[in-house]
């Protein structure tokens, strides 16, 4: 037990808490999106639903194992800590993602395949606006019917160089069949009742295969043709996205649509990344993604950068160039950075990229649908009911404290206000930085946290009563009571926190949110009791006014102490 005669500096404790509270609210008002309210879960606010349709390079149906793995990875991306309130479910060959709020782009980005490769840059050229479809020029020599005027490069053994302003095709379109002039005329076949249905998967697989044939050719002349052509369609969606072969060269565009690149085969892939984090660059003027490679990749990167100083190296994500910096020096240690293009990374985009790289690439590529709004399953009425329940619980605690402890009950109220202020600010920051959303289960955890905080006050005040029963004054009973109570308070909160931790790690769904808020309020209860309640009660014990039983509610206890002393004197007499 700590000595009750040790010097106490309550102003220091209160100052520490005020500095913490001010610092947290500065973060709330001056960082991030500056939204000053906690994010609400799907059950209270509604959300956005996006369906991701799996696509495979060969057009086959995705396997159950691949879909389950993709579901697990996307769940980790959107709900890494289990407190975002998002849902990822398998629906046939699709994954359905539901996230709180109305940001459909965020939900679609979760389906990003996130296949990262580091490729040396062989050539590049500025992107050019796509020219309108050229009209066929008159020719002195007639073309055979049904034959295209200029064979496309992808199918020509010695393709002609593309003319300036012309827009070559990446692959030929099947010409319409024409009648053979040498064959006798025959009646046209009867038109079918219905056009044969095409398989979208097979059609997409053919388009991907033709893109690979054009943009991943090993022929140098074909590479230059593909580079010139790709420069005219950087603004278009990339059919190849996430399906390029890392062992072959690649012609692609940057994510800012300003440059087309010819890239060599990959030297390092994303599965060789050990960790990815986001933060400010060394100059403090922009955001970057820091990568840490695994052992073999770290050696490869160190050797490569040492041997290729002055050359350009591209970081491709899902077949597009995210960053293409010039190597200035050898980079040992297995670490490197990815900086954004134009526009540069924001805190949100850098964090999102680091998140998808950290949890790995998907085994499948997905095509997202349009975002759909999902209505709240419970709605604001449930939120209002939860808040009313919390207010009633708080009011009962305050009434009990005022009736039983008088002025000390006011100190309880101040401590609860301090705790609530800190909880609110932390919930705002958690929603901003780890995507925490407050649902009905989380509100239940907060309400139980009020009871935990009140329990700490009761333990402290009852220990003070015990000291007064033993004959001590209110002034001397407070430090001695605190020395005895704090161990009990820490032990009780430790048990509650342990229960919350077990729930958090073993449960799924909304139970995680309940356990998270319960654990959070338990930790903050200790902070408030040590930095606010104890110093305030100590200051109150120095007041001659509050030492009066009419104000501190300890008259009955002091009467018991007087009776004990009288009995002791009678026994000695």
Curated annotation (Swiss-Prot):
It is found in: Cell membrane. It is a multi-pass membrane protein. Disulfide bonds: none annotated. Keywords: Cell membrane, Membrane, Protein transport, Translocation, Transmembrane, Transmembrane helix, Transport. Residues 135-154, 161-194 have a biased composition (Pro residues). The chain crosses the membrane at residues 13-33, 385-405, 410-430, 441-461, 489-509, 514-534. Pfam families: Sec_GG (PF07549), SecD_SecF_C (PF02355), SecDF_P1_head (PF22599). One of its GO terms (biological process) is protein transport. The keyword Lipid biosynthesis does not apply. NCBIfam families: 2A0604s01, secD. Forms a complex with SecF. Part of the essential Sec protein translocation apparatus which comprises SecA, SecYEG and auxiliary proteins SecDF. Other proteins may also be involved. Belongs to the SecD/SecF family. SecD subfamily. This is Protein translocase subunit SecD. The gene is secD.
